[in-house]
């Protein structure tokens, strides 16, 4: 019985290992997503007003693109009032960049200050090359 459980566990781990991020296509630009704070979610939403294929990253042709991300975060009680509970916000932000290059990796980071979300796009040298503009928020 132990061998069966061990074998089953190893097979499950091996199966999960295949569900990571796909290989980066060198003819495309790759944009990693990273939320800057705990208890948040940053998801790829749209590229040029078309639904993103995978919510974990963007992969785009070289050139100009507008990326839309969905950022979910809690507003802490210290920003609301003394007896308040955290308030969850669900926001979209657009980041436009005119010069994505094939084979390069970019990073899109998001965070919030109180009720206001922010997003920044970085190149491989960690230089800020784009800023997010709000595209609407709602309570979630």
Give residue spans per PLM region.
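Sec-dependent bacterial lipoprotein signal peptides
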Residues: 1-17
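Short loop/turn and low-complexity linker motifs enriched in small/turn-promoting residues
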Residues: 16-140
